[in-house]
Amino acid sequence: MMQVWKRSRNIGVWVAAIAIAGGLAVCAVLPASAEEAGNMVFYRGGFTRLSSDRSGETFANGSTGQKNDSNIGWYAGAGLDFLLSKDTWGAMDKTWAVGELGVQFNRFASNSVRGAGVSGSTTDVKTQLTMVTIDVSPKIKFREGQALRPWIIPVGLDIHVISPPSNQTQYLDIGLQFGAGAEYQVWKAFKVGLDARFHLAAGMTNTTNNYFTVGPYVGVSF
């Protein structure tokens, strides 16, 4: 358990360093060097935390009292931003409406347990607690023409797949996500950013699938 917390602390240090670098960029905000096309492909990764662990479930735990009782881990994902409007359909100047299509893999802290689920194994094997999230979300991106651009996701749609399945062998869930972040134009089409998101799931698997993420991303506009 201590090793898990140490790894999470190290991730937090990296995230803090990126946030500091972003703060320095704020002090020297420069106009963007060229007109942005509006579309972007991006890659994300960082720290994730479930609202509740899965230690009370048959498929996650072992037959000898061992438990997968941690709710922290990491995530990696990618997505596409598609420009919808450069003035939010006339509502706000220099404020873009962007549509995000993303996919994300979450791997929560996993332990070696004996005979998890229905395997009947007599040896300890690692049971991976994972979740895949596919999202379609609107982004409101502010400060057109500037190198540093904050943005928000007012509310987005999530589809979740959990593994292992719940006690009722269900694995599909639906939910909402809320997020905020900022990105900095490093050079031409290349950008770096930092975001934080909360995913609120419906619980259709009879498990609590809500989780939080924070981490950096890199993007290329096109």
Describe the residue ranges of each PLM region.
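Solvent-exposed loop segments that connect transmembrane elements
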Residues: E57-Q66, R114-T122
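Predominantly the C-terminal beta-signal and adjacent terminal strand-loop region
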Residues: E36-A37, L50-T58, T64-Q66, K94, ...
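Gram-negative (and chloroplast) outer-membrane scaffold detector with strong preference
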Residues: F47-R49, W74-S166, V214-G215, G219-F222
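Hydrophobic alpha-helical segments of small multi-pass membrane proteins
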Residues: I134-V136, P154-I159, L172-A182, A196-F198
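Substrate-binding/catalytic groove segments of enzymes
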Residues: K67-D69, A147-R149, I162-P165, V186-G193
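Cleavable N-terminal export/targeting peptides
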Residues: M1-G38
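Outer-membrane beta-barrel biogenesis signature
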Residues: L24-F42, K86-W96, Q146-A147
